[in-house]
């Protein structure tokens, strides 16, 4: 299987929605990924095998020197072939080329080896507030 990686590549919402549902184990949703990434992201990486989208990662940013890895996903049939690390490597390259100095990621425990050993991230102290209603503490 030959994989190609494309920064800010074209994609169909349906293809990313299918990858997301499979990768994050939830029902298929109709998310408008085009609007989301064009409005809020530095870029994204598409991984393809021929014409098929087999991987995707979103790179959000603060408009300055911080970028954020979101929604790394690889189709089940294409996993354990280095595609995820290829997605992250392309994200690192293009975020750096855009002038970002820091690339952040958060992830579930079972992905620690992937992000730390395979992709080269290091552990940091970070904080998190759960926003169950989307409004946060002190919202009126």
Regions found by a protein language model. Name each.
Residues 1-31, 46, 137-140:
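Short amphipathic alpha-helix that is part of the acyltransferase structural core
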Residues 32-50, 55-73:
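A conserved beta-strand-loop-helix scaffold within acyl/acetyltransferase catalytic domains
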Residues 80-93:
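Conserved acetyl-CoA-binding loop-helix of GNAT-fold acetyltransferases
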Residues 97, 101, 108-133:
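Conserved active-site alpha-helix within GNAT-family acetyltransferase domains
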């Amino acid at each position: 299987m030959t994989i190609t990686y494309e920064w800010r590549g074209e994609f169909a919402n349906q293809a990313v929605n299918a990858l997301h549902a499979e990768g994050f184990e939830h029902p298929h949703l109709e998310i408008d990924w085009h609007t989301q990434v064009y409005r809020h992201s530095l870029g994204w990486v598409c991984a393809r095998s021929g014409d098929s989208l087999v991987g995707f990662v979103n790179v959000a940013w603060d408009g300055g020197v911080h970028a954020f890895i979101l929604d790394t996903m690889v189709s089940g049939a294409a996993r354990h072939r280095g595609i995820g690390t290829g997605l992250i490597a392309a994200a690192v390259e293009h975020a750096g080329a855009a002038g970002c100095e820091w690339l952040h990621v958060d992830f579930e425990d079972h992905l620690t080896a992937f992000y730390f050993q395979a992709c080269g991230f290091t552990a940091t102290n970070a904080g998190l507030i759960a926003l169950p209603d989307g409004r946060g503490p002190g919202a009126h």
